[in-house]
Curated annotation (Swiss-Prot):
Cofactor note: Binds 1 zinc ion per subunit.
Gene name as annotated: queC2
UniProt entry keywords in alphabetical sequence: ATP-binding, Ligase, Metal-binding, Nucleotide-binding, Queuosine biosynthesis, Zinc
Cofactor(s) needed for function: Zn(2+)
Residues annotated as transmembrane: none
UniProt-recorded name of the protein: 7-cyano-7-deazaguanine synthase 2
Source species of the chain: Rhodopseudomonas palustris (strain HaA2)
Residue positions binding Zn(2+): C180, C193, C196, C199
Lineage of source species: Bacteria, Pseudomonadati, Pseudomonadota, Alphaproteobacteria, Hyphomicrobiales
Length: 210
């Protein structure tokens, strides 16, 4: 496999961290890109930074903010419930903005690829996590920046348990990444709530490995 310069859009969650470590394991020249968009989950940025430090991967961060509507975080939904509706936690425009910024940054540093942890075999029902969205975005980028970095989604058609299995082979453990929408402070430590959709999906993914 030819060595490439790969920029990974990296939140600190399981999917994007798996992409990051897989690209590194394949021998590519890898860098991590985080987007600080005024999110409530600064803990995810801390996890991403810690992962990059642990694996000696350069970390880039873009700071951007825009007006966001208040969102309700649903609790204790089953995986089956998540499959049949768009979560109230969906943030319109987020992936559209992230991929545009990521692609521009990838072009700026001379990367061959922008890798993303997009996963359409998911239960969130997010319209910007579908094969149609991904294919359409790739088409737009090819028109708007022909010859630019390729947008690659290595996990696109993998299930959550399959991603967890791959993550495990790369050395990741269940608590090495952060996905929770509602971090809690317990006994002076930041912990996942265990009730939001992200926590339930994370639990589902890793339980399947037992």
């Amino acid at each position: 496999m030819a060595r490439k310069k790969v920029l990974v859009l990296h939140s600190g969650g399981m999917d994007s961290t798996t992409c990051l470590l897989q690209a590194k394991a394949e021998g590519h020249d890898v860098a991590s890109l985080g987007i600080d968009y005024g999110q409530r989950l600064l803990v995810e940025m801390m996890f991403a930074e810690g992962q990059c430090e642990k694996y000696s991967i350069p970390r880039h961060v873009i700071n951007v903010n825009w007006q966001k509507a208040e969102r309700q975080i649903p609790l204790n939904r089953s995986v089956e419930e998540m499959a049949h509706s768009v979560s109230p936690a969906f943030l319109p425009g987020r992936n559209i903005v992230f991929l545009g910024l990521g692609h521009a940054h990838a072009a700026g540093i001379g990367a061959d690829e922008l890798q993303i942890g997009l996963n359409c075999v998911d239960f969130s029902g997010y319209p910007d996590c579908t094969t149609q969205f991904y294919d359409s975005y790739c088409t737009m980028l090819n028109i708007g920046n022909p010859g630019g970095p390729k947008l690659v989604a290595p996990l696109l058609k993998m299930s959550k348990p399959e991603i967890a299995r791959l993550a495990s082979t790369l050395g990741l453990q269940r608590n090495d990444t952060w996905s929770c929408y509602r971090p809690q402070i317990r006994e002076g430590s930041i912990v996942a709530c265990g009730e939001c959709d992200a926590c339930k999906l994370h639990e589902f993914a890793w339980q399947e490995l037992k």
